[in-house]
Amino acid sequence: MQGRLSAWLVKRGLIHRSLGFDYQGIETLQIKPKDWHSIAVILYVYGYNYLRSQCAYDVAPGGLLASVYHLTRIEYGGDQPEEVCIKVFASRRNPRIPSVFWVWKSVDFQERESYDMLGISYDNHPRLKRILMPESWIGWPLRKDYIAPNFYEIQDAH
């Protein structure tokens, strides 16, 4: 079943894949990494002016990594804001996705957290560096194939 946004994208020749609807009726779309930045700009111009959240997850051990964006179309005088969920999958070997920082500034720390925990590199992000783990940390703690070190160095807080 195709939703309103998916039909609108098809009508304009924008490549995507509909993944259906969640339990709240929010449409979920899959966008290829190479198409993501241009489609993000188009969605912003179309009215999706609020990025509610961005997160990432490891699909399966040895499999793909996913970056997920929850967008909201807020219109003045509208009763119910329209929402959409966008999933962008990246290969585990070289997980690179265009950053949408220059479209929605609120994604700044969220993309940094996804980089820090899963190793997804967001191209053209102005400050892509670890945010939770120390810069010296090796590996990506939320990947399903991550092997936790058997020691932890206690650092002085001073």
UniProtKB/Swiss-Prot annotation:
GO molecular function: NADH dehydrogenase (ubiquinone) activity; quinone binding
E.C. number(s) listed in UniProt: 7.1.1.-
Membrane topology: Peripheral membrane protein
GO biological process: photosynthesis, light reaction
Gene3D superfamilies (alphabetical): NADH:ubiquinone oxidoreductase, 30kDa subunit
GO cellular-component term (any): chloroplast thylakoid membrane
Main location as per UniProt: plastid
Entry's localization field: Plastid, Chloroplast thylakoid membrane
Keywords from the UniProt entry: Chloroplast, Membrane, NAD, NADP, Plastid, Plastoquinone, Quinone, Thylakoid, Translocase, Transport
Reactions catalysed according to its record: a plastoquinone + NADH + (n+1) H(+)(in) = a plastoquinol + NAD(+) + n H(+)(out); a plastoquinone + NADPH + (n+1) H(+)(in) = a plastoquinol + NADP(+) + n H(+)(out)
Family to which the UniProt record says this protein belongs: Belongs to the complex I 30 kDa subunit family.
General function of this protein: NDH shuttles electrons from NAD(P)H:plastoquinone, via FMN and iron-sulfur (Fe-S) centers, to quinones in the photosynthetic chain and possibly in a chloroplast respiratory chain. The immediate electron acceptor for the enzyme in this species is believed to be plastoquinone. Couples the redox reaction to proton translocation, and thus conserves the redox energy in a proton gradient.
Assembly and interaction partners: NDH is composed of at least 16 different subunits, 5 of which are encoded in the nucleus.
Designated name of the protein: NAD(P)H-quinone oxidoreductase subunit J, chloroplastic
Gene behind this protein: ndhJ
